[in-house]
Swiss-Prot record:
Metabolomic profiling of different yfcC over-expression and deletion strains suggests that it may affect the glyoxylate shunt. It is a multi-pass membrane protein. Keywords: Antiport, Cell inner membrane, Cell membrane, Membrane, Transmembrane, Transmembrane helix, Transport. This is Putative basic amino acid antiporter YfcC. The keyword Transmembrane applies. It is found in: Cell inner membrane. GO terms for cellular component: plasma membrane. To H.influenzae HI_0594. It comes from Escherichia coli (strain K12). GO terms for molecular function: antiporter activity. Its main location: membrane. The chain crosses the membrane at residues 19-39, 107-127, 148-168, 171-191, 208-228, 231-251, 287-307, 310-330, 352-372, 398-418, 419-439, 442-462, 485-505.
């Protein structure tokens, strides 16, 4: 009698969906509120000079921290409940809705979510005209053999945009156009994420003049605005080279063997779409579409740099672009476009953004569980912030500088706004640095590196999730690639921060 052994199929561990990860983080965050008491800082106004103008910012008073107590003198806790009603603090089951509807039109979550839907719809119209697909085919035909040059050219331009004017959300719009180009060139949509949004964040983090990060942090820390630019420019060059080389190596591997791409299946959308595209002569209508598209991009950059336009204005600019291009498409019958297909294209483009928009709202809800992240608000976050600051105070100055970098990187998971994080952390860490011998310029370096580079992998980064959404890249597929690049940049950041402290950078 022979024994028959049945082989059981091996179960491979699969990375949980991003929503599952966020919900698990929400549970851990809720549990923390049961053991960590609520703390509070008083807020104060600080002034700093930018381009000859006096700016003000609401920040915490580092000497005012206190644990809130009840009438019996015992520490007060804002323990997250399972479910709450009315204007009570959100419970665990409330955090998705509260996160999705929080904020204003100027930021996370509702402002960013509406921004994503509007630009998704606007570019849905642009792509429906067929001009972009037709232009990509023509571009490839005229640059055959030199395709690899697109990657360094785009990467450097986007990194420069992040360094000079804090480019971030704007990269989403460019990614919509560049994604089909990269796939057509034999790369993948992860390459698009790298050359657009990730490049902007490398520039953002290593900038010498970013108005939303380094300028605000220097102003709050009492360091002359735009000082220390020499080292920062060198760091920007090094960081950009690291990111560019990483991207070139990754893109080359994917081009040689497309099956190595983690998004080979999801990129089928772009490949199938391209298979249906037939090369046709460029018409006058196509040229009008490209002229309007280029003009709006210039208009957006001008508005951000000159007038400090932000989410509401940029979204309205892209809506204007979509409307005008849609009218051109209807008038010139581009790709058989009608008024009805113009409307359905807007809806389809917006629909593509729903999944990443949900992630943005859910991530914001996590912050609401521990406090709103605003200077002067009572929250668990303040207690954690003060405790970590006290722990750093007992370290050697070079080690303390490195721990400031690490702390800023972790803290950025909860407060992804560069200026918001500066308002919460710099008033504490700048004077703390004085006590342990860390130069304030180094403290600012630790802040900008920790704040900027960690945007590469945090699902709480609205712009990252939006870029992944338009490129149809699942966060789980992005995480391994992004974490590897972040590791390289964190090593560089650590060397720079410790080296700057030891060399007396100021």
């Amino acid at each position: 009698m022979s024994a028959i052994t049945e082989s059981k199929p091996t179960r491979r561990w699969a990375m949980p969906d991003t929503l599952v990860i966020i919900f698990f983080v929400a549970i851990l965050t809720s549990l923390a509120t049961w053991v960590v008491p609520v703390g509070m800082f008083d807020s104060q106004e600080v002034q700093y000079q930018v381009d000859g103008q006096t700016k003000t910012r609401k920040v915490v008073d580092p000497h005012s921290f206190r644990i809130l107590t009840n009438e019996a003198g015992e520490p007060e806790y804002h323990r997250v409940q399972l479910f709450t009603t009315g204007d009570e603090r959100p419970g665990l089951m409330n955090f998705p809705f509260e996160g999705l509807t929080s904020g204003s039109k100027y930021g996370t979550a509702v402002g960013i979510i509406m921004f994503m839907l509007v630009i998704g719809g606007a570019f849905g119209i642009v792509m429906r005209t067929g001009t972009i697909d037709n232009g990509i085919l023509a571009l490839i035909r005229h640059t055959r053999g030199n395709e690899i040059l697109f990657i360094p050219a785009l990467f450097i331009l986007f990194s420069l945009g992040g360094a000079v004017f804090g480019m971030g959300e704007e990269a989403v719009a460019f990614a919509i156009i560049i994604a089909p180009l990269m796939v057509r060139l034999g790369y993948d949509s992860i390459t698009t994420v790298l050359v657009t949004y990730i490049a902007t964040q490398i520039g953002f983090a290593s900038s010498w003049m970013n108005p939303f990060c380094v300028v605000v942090a220097q102003g709050i820390a009492g360091v002359p605005v735009l000082s220390g630019s020499g080292l920062r420019i060198v760091v920007w060059v090094i960081a950009t080279l690291i990111g560019l080389i990483f991207t070139m190596v990754y893109a080359s591997r994917v081009k040689k063997n497309p099956l190595l791409s983690r998004v080979h299946e999801s990129d089928r959308f772009f490949r199938e779409k391209q298979a249906d595209v037939e090369q046709r002569p460029f018409t006058f209508g196509d040229w009008l579409v490209l002229i309007v598209l280029t003009a709006v991009m210039v208009w957006v950059i001008w508005g951000v740099i000159v007038n400090a336009w932000f989410i509401p204005e940029i979204a309205s600019q892209f809506f204007t672009m979509g409307l005008v291009i849609g009218i051109i498409g209807v008038v010139f019958r581009l790709n058989g476009m009608t008024v009805n297909t113009m409307a359905s294209s807007f809806t389809e483009g917006a629909r593509m953004m729903i999944a990443p928009a949900l992630l943005v709202g859910f991530a914001k809800g996590i912050l609401l569980l521990v406090g709103n992240g605003e200077a002067g608000d009572a929250s668990v976050l303040n207690t954690i912030l003060n405790s970590i600051a006290n722990a750093i105070s007992g370290l050697d100055n070079a080690v303390a500088a490195w721990f400031m970098l690490l702390f800023q990187a972790v803290f950025n998971f909860f407060v992804t706004s560069g200026s918001g994080q500066a308002a919460l952390t710099m008033p504490l860490l700048a004077p703390l640095g004085d006590l342990v011998g860390v130069n304030r310029q180094v403290t600012v370096l630790a802040f900008q590196f920790g704040d900027g580079f960690s945007h590469i992998i945090y699902p709480t980064s609205a712009s990252l999730m939006a870029t992944l959404g338009v490129c149809r890249v699942d966060f789980r597929n992005w995480l391994k690639v992004g974490a590897t690049l972040l590791g390289l940049l964190f090593i560089m950041s650590s060397v720079v921060v410790i080296g700057a402290q030891l060399m007396g950078y100021h």
